[in-house]
Amino acid sequence: MVENVIWPAALDANRSRSDGRRVSLDLAVENPTVDEIAKAVQQVGYDAVIERDKTYPREYEGRGRVVVKDADDATKSDLLGAVAAYMQALRE
């Protein structure tokens, strides 16, 4: 069983690659929330668990994280790309 962790910083357009962004600026969104990420993960077809008490190491204030369960068939970068694309569609 593979668990992937998605931090909001990985999809944040306001962050640089060195600050933790994992997708291109074309796919990134501004200030993503864990609720939006979890909804996008579920729409992509995976189970998501929100952990609100977790803090990304490079952030002062904690925004939480989303744990993706049983994503054995996708790499983390594929998963992040699909989630980011769905989040962009949600915001339009």
Curated annotation (Swiss-Prot):
GO molecular function: 7S RNA binding
InterPro entries: Signal_recog_particle_SRP19 (IPR002778), SRP19 (IPR053394), SRP19-like_sf (IPR036521), SRP19_arc-type (IPR022938)
SUPFAM superfamilies: SRP19
Keywords: Cytoplasm, Ribonucleoprotein, RNA-binding, Signal recognition particle
Compartment(s) of residence: Cytoplasm
Entries under Gene3D superfamilies matching the protein: Signal recognition particle, SRP19-like subunit (3.30.56.30)
GO BP: SRP-dependent cotranslational protein targeting to membrane, signal sequence recognition
Top-rank taxon, per record: Archaea
Chief localization: cytoplasm
GO CC terms of this entry: signal recognition particle
Family that this chain belongs to: Belongs to the SRP19 family.
HAMAP family linked: SRP19
Subunit annotation: Part of the signal recognition particle protein translocation system, which is composed of SRP and FtsY. Archaeal SRP consists of a 7S RNA molecule of 300 nucleotides and two protein subunits: SRP54 and SRP19.
Function of the molecule: Involved in targeting and insertion of nascent membrane proteins into the cytoplasmic membrane. Binds directly to 7S RNA and mediates binding of the 54 kDa subunit of the SRP.
Listed name of the protein: Signal recognition particle 19 kDa protein
Name of the encoding gene: srp19
